Swiss-Prot record:
It comes from Pyrococcus abyssi (strain GE5 / Orsay). It is a multi-pass membrane protein. It catalyses: alpha-ribazole + adenosylcob(III)inamide-GDP = adenosylcob(III)alamin + GMP + H(+); alpha-ribazole 5'-phosphate + adenosylcob(III)inamide-GDP = adenosylcob(III)alamin 5'-phosphate + GMP + H(+). InterPro entries: CobS (IPR003805). It is an enzyme of class 2 (transferase). Keywords: Cell membrane, Cobalamin biosynthesis, Magnesium, Membrane, Transferase, Transmembrane, Transmembrane helix. HAMAP family: CobS. The keyword Transmembrane helix applies. This is Adenosylcobinamide-GDP ribazoletransferase. GO terms for molecular function: adenosylcobinamide-GDP ribazoletransferase activity; cobalamin 5'-phosphate synthase activity. Belongs to the CobS family. The lineage of its organism: Archaea, Methanobacteriati, Methanobacteriota, Thermococci, Thermococcales. Its EC number is 2.7.8.26.
């Protein structure tokens, strides 16, 4: 897992670029690292815990995925053919669609966390990291960037190990609180982003993966919030 950490977090560890694509199966494991501080903040219920938990999460994982979400949203929303959409996504200037997407995702996360138990951020992060693994499993790269490089190393074995890890990491939370199982539905957002990416761009790049991570995390928290309303 050490080699994949520099690509998914800001943790100052030295990873081997060549070996990283052989550790894609470890994506779900990264959620243990990225969510530990937010979990502690939410568990202690300190003032503004929902805001501080989210800030601490982005302190660990960085803002690269949020930037990818903004670029992805600009590309999705622009009118025109596939070439024009890809050009808009790669534009260095962030458009109104990108700004709107980032604001909505942040708002949904902050508001949802104020209603949810401490472990919700862990489930959301687990889904977030697993969604990127699912995106890589499509083996449909867009361009020759980091996403394409990782897809070259993606295979059935890595996906199978990743799925097993996802289940094993999710299971303890379900044992603790069976209602946490509703969080699995958050993966529907991953599927939707993958579908939109393939339909609009014809492939998946780093921006698409970032959008998957952010939208899946926010969507999972929203689903858990609604499930809480119906189960209490």
């Amino acid at each position: 897992m050490r080699n994949i950490l520099p690509f998914l977090t800001r943790i100052p560890v030295k990873g081997d670029f060549e070996k990283a694509r052989n550790e894609l199966w470890a994506f779900p494991l990264v959620s243990l690292v990225s969510s530990i501080i937010p979990i502690a903040i939410l568990y202690l219920r300190i003032p503004l815990a929902n805001v501080l938990a989210l800030l601490s999460l982005y302190f660990v994982i960085g803002l690269l995925h949020l930037d990818g979400l903004a670029d992805w949203a600009d590309g999705i929303m622009v009118k025109g053919d596939r070439e024009r959409k890809i050009k808009a996504m790669k534009d260095l200037n962030t458009g109104i669609a990108g700004v709107f997407a980032v604001v909505v995702v942040l708002f949904l996360q902050v508001y949802s966390l104020s209603m949810l138990p401490f472990y919700a951020i862990y489930i959301a992060e687990l889904n977030s990291k697993f969604s990127m693994l699912l995106g890589l499993a499509t083996k449909k790269p867009l361009g020759q960037g980091l996403g394409a490089y990782f897809m070259e190393g993606m295979n059935g074995r890595q996906l199978a190990i990743g799925v097993v890890l996802y289940v094993l990491l999710y299971l303890p939370v379900v044992i603790y609180d069976p209602s946490a199982l509703f969080g699995v539905m958050g993966l529907v957002f991953a599927w939707y982003v993958i579908r939109l990416s393939l339909e609009n761009f014809g492939g998946i790049n780093g921006d698409c993966l970032g959008a998957m991570a952010e939208i899946t995390r926010a969507g999972t928290l929203v689903i858990l919030s609604f499930s809480l309303c119906f189960t209490t």
